[in-house]
Structures are given as structure tokens and as C-alpha cells.
């Protein structure tokens, strides 16, 4: 993996994972949006959001002797929204495509990351919802995992 130009770039962990997952879903013909997207959304689509959690305790000592957290717990939330009056298989297909992308995280997600490596990711919950007013089907799919900053990605100086 390449060396990051600076620490702020290296610590854009949530954005990096969201972008990698988004790229892979797009390759599977799944319309998706990052957590803070301002686009007008039309079903079917998937919202992608990553939240960084507690550091795992793995440290990296930089050139200034500062011990920096190098591994973090994270959660990946994917919200599928489909129109019930359209093709009913779309919702099921989106769920299956998401599971397939996540199942191959070692090769596909990590291959799309520049400075980070997903060490593990696990399905933690799926919750179906129904929006009666809009006739929308929604599923919230939750995954949890650990992401590491790659050893060779640390900047040369602070």
C-alpha cells in the first residue's frame, strides 16, 4: 500500500470504507449514496454509512515517538430502499448483492482501500421496515468489523 501524504488523509477512515463499499456496490449495479450525500434519491437505492468505534489497542509509533492508534472497531450500516409497486425482486436482489460484497471483503473491499485494511467484518443485524405512506420497503443491514491502518501507509513525518 502507498504511504499517505499526511495524517489527516490517513485518518479519513470512515470516508475510505464508505467509498470502497460504494464502488463495489456500483459494480454490482446497486444504486447507492454515501452517508452525507445531498443527491435527490429515487428508489431503489442503498444508503452507505460507516461509524468508527473504539480503538482496539494496536499502536503505531511514529517518527516523533508518538504512539498512535492503528486499529479501530467500526460499524457499517446499509439501508436498502425499494418501491413495493415496482419489481419486488429488487429488494431481495440488493440484499443478496450486499451479502456477496461483504463476504468477499478480503479481496474486494481491501482491494479498493488505499491506506487501510479491513481485518474482519461480520453481519450483526438485519431489520426490515415498511413505510405505509410511501409504499417503500426498507431494510437496515448492520455489519461490524475491525479496520487497520496499513503499516506501510503511515506518513514519513508529522
Question: Where are the predicted features?
Answer:
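Small/polar-rich, solvent-exposed N-terminal microdomains that initiate assembly or binding
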Residues: 1-67, 105-113, 154-158
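Short, surface-exposed loop/turn motifs that are enriched in glycine and acidic residues
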Residues: 7, 87-88
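Acidic-leaning, charged glycine-interspersed low-complexity segments
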Residues: 46, 99-148, 156-158
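Oligomerization/assembly interface segments of phage tail-like spikes and tubes
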Residues: 68-86, 136-151
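Mid-chain, well-packed structural core segment of small domains
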Residues: 89-94
Amino acid at each position: 500500500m502507498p504511504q499517505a501524504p499526511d495524517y489527516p488523509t490517513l485518518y479519513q477512515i470512515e470516508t475510505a470504507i464508505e467509498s470502497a463499499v460504494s464502488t463495489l456496490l456500483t459494480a454490482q449495479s446497486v444504486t447507492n449514496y454515501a452517508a452525507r450525500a445531498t443527491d435527490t434519491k429515487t428508489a431503489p437505492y442503498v444508503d452507505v454509512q460507516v461509524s468508527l468505534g473504539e480503538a482496539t489497542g494496536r499502536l503505531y509509533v511514529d517518527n516523533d515517538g508518538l504512539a498512535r492508534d492503528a486499529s479501530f472497531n467500526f460499524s457499517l450500516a446499509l439501508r436498502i430502499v425499494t418501491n413495493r409497486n415496482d419489481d419486488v425482486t429488487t429488494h431481495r436482489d440488493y440484499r443478496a448483492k450486499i451479502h456477496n460484497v461483504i463476504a468477499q471483503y478480503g479481496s474486494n473491499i481491501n482491494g479498493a482501500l488505499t491506506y487501510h485494511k479491513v481485518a474482519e467484518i461480520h453481519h450483526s443485524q438485519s431489520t426490515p421496515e415498511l413505510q405505509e405512506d410511501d409504499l417503500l420497503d426498507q431494510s437496515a443491514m448492520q455489519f461490524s468489523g475491525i479496520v487497520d491502518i496499513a503499516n506501510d501507509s503511515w506518513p514519513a513525518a508529522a
